[in-house]
């Protein structure tokens, strides 16, 4: 049997790890709607430390969106999308849903972010040229089979839409190559099995719920009783399929087969944010928690997965020479002009000052 190592605040299991040969490393990100703000925090901490030893990336729904920002090396991007765009009424509108429209407008979200905050796909292309692969999971609408798409400049945004098309809330689904797709979380919310199938020996899995959370059977029984004889019966069948798949994935993570090693990063308790309709303060708290969990992972596990240690947060103190030269004082009314970097997201003040703990 393989090995599962839980990584969260308050868990000391990572502290007892010994050096090992990781082999092919995969980064797998769970969906979860706005709960993906936790994943955004973890991945922003990875980017701050320039930590990217992964050979393979797999994500579903919000996990695919977060990984897109990580692969394009845009720190702060996913946090902005979740906190500034998914909280707008243009995206999430219960009144529109009651009137027969979509509860979530993925078309608006994708178009707005693409025009105002485009992904740096050229950066990702160079990563792919080096031999690394990224797969986004979407689920076929006809038989619920999971499909894994390699994004290109031409289809990247369409695949994100397909992977995030929550059934019932985005009624039409997304058509790719003549086939209708829905949210990949229906059949493969955490694509760990696909990562293992593609040869990964070490998996770093970022969850958006505490580990070992299962669905409550009583909840399903009530829903079946309420909706069993209605026109929503297909939706009940779909949710049951998702529940069975999710339970199977959870058991795979808890008891990895063979010599597979799984590092599971997860929040120590349920997040303040929810899948849709979260408040800004809740999102901010969960983002900070993700940053802290990412930092804990880097301090304990990160150095074992790469030959080059992750960058530390604190710099080595500068030795001051004995003779100190004091420059002339600036004119009192001079305006301080800060140097501006052209790097994507580099001038995001909220990101730079976020969570300095």
Curated annotation (Swiss-Prot):
Positions of the PNPLA domain: 27-196
E.C. code: 3.1.1.-
Signal peptide coordinates: none
Motif (GXGXXG) on chain: 31-36
UniProt entry tagged with the keyword Hydrolase: yes
GO BP annotations listed: DNA damage response; lipid catabolic process
Residue window of motif GXSXG: 59-63
Class of this enzyme: hydrolase
Cystine pairs: none
Active site feature: 61 (nucleophile), 183 (proton acceptor)
GO molecular function, one term: hydrolase activity
Pfam families, per database record: DUF6363, Patatin
Keywords, in A-Z order: Hydrolase, Lipid degradation, Lipid metabolism
Motif (DGA/G): 183-185
Gene3D superfamilies assigned to the protein according to its UniProt record, in alphabetical order: Cytosolic phospholipase A2 catalytic domain
Function, in words: Probable lipid hydrolase.
Entry-linked PANTHER family: NEUROPATHY TARGET ESTERASE/SWISS CHEESE D.MELANOGASTER, PHOSPHOESTERASE
Entry protein name: Uncharacterized protein YjjU
Source organism of the structure: Escherichia coli (strain K12)
Source lineage: Bacteria, Pseudomonadati, Pseudomonadota, Gammaproteobacteria, Enterobacterales
């Amino acid at each position: 049997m393989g090995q599962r190592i839980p990584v969260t605040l308050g868990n000391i299991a990572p502290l007892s790890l010994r050096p090992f040969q990781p082999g092919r490393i995969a980064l797998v990100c769970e969906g979860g709607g706005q709960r993906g703000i936790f994943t955004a925090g973890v991945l922003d901490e990875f980017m701050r430390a320039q930590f990217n030893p992964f050979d393979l990336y797999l994500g579903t729904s919000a996990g695919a969106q977060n990984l897109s920002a990580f692969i394009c090396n845009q720190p702060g991007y996913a946090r902005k999308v979740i906190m500034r765009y998914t909280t707008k009424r243009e995206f999430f509108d219960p009144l529109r849903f009651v009137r027969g429209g979509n509860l979530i407008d993925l078309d608006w979200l994708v178009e707005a972010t693409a025009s105002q905050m485009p992904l740096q796909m050229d950066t990702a292309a160079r990563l792919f040229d080096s031999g690394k692969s990224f797969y986004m999971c979407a689920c076929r609408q006809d038989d619920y089979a999971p499909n894994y798409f390699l994004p290109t400049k031409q289809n990247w945004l369409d695949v994100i839409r397909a992977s995030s098309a929550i059934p019932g809330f985005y009624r039409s689904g997304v058509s790719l190559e003549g086939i209708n797709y829905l949210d990949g979380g229906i059949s493969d919310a955490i694509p760990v099995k696909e990562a293992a199938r593609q040869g990964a020996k070490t998996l770093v899995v970022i969850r958006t719920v505490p580990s070992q959370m299962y669905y409550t059977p009583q909840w399903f029984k009530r829903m079946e009783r309420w909706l069993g004889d209605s026109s929503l019966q297909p939706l009940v069948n779909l949710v049951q399929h998702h529940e069975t798949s999710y339970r199977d994935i959870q058991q795979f993570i808890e008891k990895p087969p063979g010599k597979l090693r799984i590092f599971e990063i997860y929040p120590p308790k349920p997040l303040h944010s929810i899948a849709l309709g979260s408040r800004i303060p809740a999102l901010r708290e969960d983002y900070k928690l993700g940053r802290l969990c990412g930092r804990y992972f880097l301090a304990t596990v990160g150095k074992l997965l790469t030959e080059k240690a992750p960058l530390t947060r604190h710099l080595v103190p500068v030795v001051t020479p004995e003779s100190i030269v004091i420059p002339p004082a600036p004119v009192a009314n001079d305006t301080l002009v800060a140097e501006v970097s052209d790097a994507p997201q580099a001038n995001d003040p909220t990101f730079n000052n976020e969570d300095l703990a």
